Amino acid sequence: MGRMSGEILDNRGRGTAGWSWPSIHPEGRKFGLIAAVASLGAALMAWETIAWPLAFLTLGVLAFFRDPVRVTPRDDRFVVSPADGLITLIQKVPPPRELCADDGSGVRGMNDAPVTRVSIFMSVFDVHINRSPIAGTIRRVVYIPGKFLNADLDKASEENERQHFLVERADGVQIGFTQIAGLIARRIVPFVKGGDIVAVGQRVGLIRFGSRVDVYLPAGTEPKVLMGQKVIAGETVLAEIGEAPMIEGIGQ
């Protein structure tokens, strides 16, 4: 029996756990259906050289849009990863101006002083459903059209198609994060809008076919993850609010 959505689990043995097939997000079902119909049509026409590649394409599309249940730690101190992928950049930078500038709505933006940005690169093999790193209210959702450079490049955060989110907790702590399209990704799909209240680990959007997510930590907060580390959306603790540990690791 696999994890059940909404089930409470803990480190004392409460809850049930086991492997199960992940569900397919509705955004991906239409693509999977198109590929499956094309594969079936080719098979019925005895076009095996076309049918087999289309069959593998169908499996690939369904795998890309898989949406597994995640066990999110419930602790107000924790900032959880919004994305599956690899930590490729950790830098001190000012937050995007779209998250800082007065947008005329009366909603307070982030301070424009440099903070730590953690960049998570998602390959085509990773789950591409993105989740909220903290619980709170979505204060801003800002879409910026742009280029489709390699999402692993630093300049992708300023030149690529991207979508910014600003989440604010009840105590005023704010975290910004940005979905960035990559070489293959051509569509960023949000599931939330400004004013929505979200839980930590709640699904907030997806990027199709390879991309990156940047997280802007609050001032005085440093990551608990390392360069090159693999993280899991909604489960891996990226940081603890107000904590700035120095952590080293070794590749082995």
From Swiss-Prot:
Enzyme class, UniProt record, top EC level: lyase
Cofactor note as given: Binds 1 pyruvoyl group covalently per subunit.
Biological or metabolic pathway of the protein: Phospholipid metabolism; phosphatidylethanolamine biosynthesis; phosphatidylethanolamine from CDP-diacylglycerol: step 2/2
GO molecular function: phosphatidylserine decarboxylase activity
The enzyme's E.C. designation: 4.1.1.65
UniProt cofactor(s): pyruvate
Active site: S211
Alphabetical keyword list: Cell membrane, Decarboxylase, Lipid biosynthesis, Lipid metabolism, Lyase, Membrane, Phospholipid biosynthesis, Phospholipid metabolism, Pyruvate, Zymogen
Major subcellular location class: membrane
Entry comment on modification after translation: Is synthesized initially as an inactive proenzyme. Formation of the active enzyme involves a self-maturation process in which the active site pyruvoyl group is generated from an internal serine residue via an autocatalytic post-translational modification. Two non-identical subunits are generated from the proenzyme in this reaction, and the pyruvate is formed at the N-terminus of the alpha chain, which is derived from the carboxyl end of the proenzyme.
Record site: Cleavage (non-hydrolytic): G210, S211
InterPro entries: PS_Dcarbxylase, PSD-A
Catalytic activity annotation: a 1,2-diacyl-sn-glycero-3-phospho-L-serine + H(+) = a 1,2-diacyl-sn-glycero-3-phosphoethanolamine + CO2
Record's subcellular location: Cell membrane
GO CC annotation, single: plasma membrane
Membrane topology note: Peripheral membrane protein
Gene Ontology BP, a term: phosphatidylethanolamine biosynthetic process
Keyword Lyase: yes
Function: Catalyzes the formation of phosphatidylethanolamine (PtdEtn) from phosphatidylserine (PtdSer).
Family: Belongs to the phosphatidylserine decarboxylase family. PSD-A subfamily.
Quaternary structure annotation from Swiss-Prot or TrEMBL: Heterodimer of a large membrane-associated beta subunit and a small pyruvoyl-containing alpha subunit.
Protein name per its UniProtKB record: Phosphatidylserine decarboxylase proenzyme
Lineage of the species this protein comes from: Bacteria, Pseudomonadati, Pseudomonadota, Alphaproteobacteria, Sphingomonadales
